[in-house]
Amino acid sequence: MVRQLLLVPLVVLPAISIASEAELAAKFGYEHIYLDVGSGTTNKDWLDNSNATTLGLGGNYLITDNWLFNVDYSAQFFHPDDLTLRVDRLLFGGGYRYGINDQLDVYGTYGLGALKAKATDEKTDSTISSDTEFLQAVTFGANYLLNEQWMVSAQIQANRSDVVDENKYRIGFNYQWHDVIGTGLYYQYRDTDYSGESSDYINEVGLSLKFLF
């Protein structure tokens, strides 16, 4: 009887732990689809300080309570003089999340994909140059819940290709005003190095939509 009583906590505690991880994953809204729309300025002289517009689409799917699969797509547009420069990135990856406590959560992911950079003449709509290269990225981030609706997130990503190397630093706020839909604001700093040239940067702000499932 004593032995059976001692075994009860060993059976119950893992169940409690698993339930807690599942609840935390849902609380932080890990299973979601997001849409970002941003705009910013660049210090590139050859772009005449033109604005940069960014679109982002992606999402996460939890394989277990901690391991996740994610997809990220983004498109950047620049319009210097009579040109349109477009940079597309597509990444498929996976990673691990861990709940520190009921309010703080951290994660890390690694992704593989492709990058396409294309320059088009706006007058003739002809392609001036087009390159497609292998892309890989490492991402680390943290989420902090202020309350049940408000969440602050911080993220660092390093992505590498033969066309451009980029380090991104992002901080954002999300308000989950519905069981499914949330909206937010973000600021993002991009430190870029195009084909071995000197480092340049883009300051970017934007709006985000988050759809939980």
Q: Model features per residue range: what roles?
A:
Residues 144, 173-182, 200-213:
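Outer-membrane beta-barrel "beta-signal"
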Residues 29-31, 49-55, 86-90, 114, ...:
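Residues that define the transmembrane beta-barrel architecture of outer-membrane proteins
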Residues 32-33, 65-71, 102-106, 146-154, ...:
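Repeated loop/turn-to-beta-strand initiation elements of outer-membrane beta-barrel proteins
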Residues 43-50, 80-87, 118-129, 156-157, ...:
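Outer-membrane beta-barrel translocator domains and adjoining extracellular loop/strand segments
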